[in-house]
Amino acid sequence: MCDDDVAALVVDNGSGMVKAGFAGDDAPRAVFPSIVGRPRHQGVMVGMGQKDSYVGDEAQSKRGILTLKYPIEHGIVTNWDDMEKIWHHTFYNELRVAPEEHPVLLTEAPLNPKANREKMTQIMFETFNSPAMYVAIQAVLSLYASGRTTGIVFDSGDGVSHTVPIYEGYALPHAILRLDLAGRDLTDYLMKILTERGYSFTTTAEREIVRDIKEKLCYVALDFEQEMQTAASSSSLEKSYELPDGQVITIGNERFRAPEALFQPAFLGMESAGIHETCYNSIMKCDVDIRKDLYANSVLSGGSTMYPIAADRMQKEITALAPPTMKIKIIAPPERKYSVWIGGSILASLSTFQQMWISKQEYDESGPSIVHRKCF
């Protein structure tokens, strides 16, 4: 490769998973949990070369002896030291690149505090010496990945959900709605309702087991009341799950009660509107002339939209809210778990995007606040 043709790095820092790879690729090279684990017990084996912290998959596999922490909560970085560890791990261990040689595209949830992206910018330039960087809004990238420039994206990951209406490539900031209800809340809720069944899950390691149960067995009910009756009258909906110690647990109506909280946040004691209403409210904040285009291009993105039947339920709920003659189309791409990353890969490899990067020189002249001027 000659100097001017260095591949950009695309890093989608989710609250739950980091997706990282090279611009122009069709899928991320590295996908690992955004966790940093620290030993719960003092090491007794002298000379074992025990580390004081573990990142990602290694932390996940040693979770029995570690306390696991997620440095990103609700899409906002709450622990910058741990975040640096995750980025360091991403560049040096997963992608095996020198970050000072590649421009890097990072992603962020909309309506994040300004300080969050300033600090991201500062760390990239000062700690990792990046030659250039850019911060893109996650939902906009998902829309690019679906091959559209107009539509409304409902993006729900592990830490935060948001609806972003986009018209001809521009996000409409006044109509963006954010919902701090996502995968991690559903995991916590599933822990709670499984405890009511008599199974106890309390530690950070056990939470990871529940997350796995959620990902493997949960689904969205098309009609919640009806499903509850079915579950009460027969055992057809029951599934069993084997815990790491060989114990087998049975899970019934919890399979759809947990994801139902997306549509009925009251289950979690939250007063916000469900995801279908949030989508509708977001569309209603837009100009009356473009609503038709948004209804017909509603794109789902993120891991928490991966539940079976989620798209059908969304279609049903939004149809009930929208005007009767409106054509409503919910688009649920099969790769939507990674569509933010894929959109980033597309964006960073466009020739027209190359002048959009914030260069090291610009950063040195203006400081971290440049990110608000250059990145929308």
Curated annotation (Swiss-Prot):
SMART domains: ACTIN. The modification Tele-methylhistidine is found at H74. GO terms for cellular component: cytoplasm; cytoskeleton. Keywords: Acetylation, ATP-binding, Cytoplasm, Cytoskeleton, Hydrolase, Methylation, Nucleotide-binding, Oxidation. It catalyses: ATP + H2O = ADP + phosphate + H(+). SUPFAM superfamilies: Actin-like ATPase domain. This is Actin, cytoskeletal 2A. It comes from Strongylocentrotus purpuratus. The lineage of its organism: Eukaryota, Metazoa, Echinodermata, Eleutherozoa, Echinozoa. The gene is CYIIA.
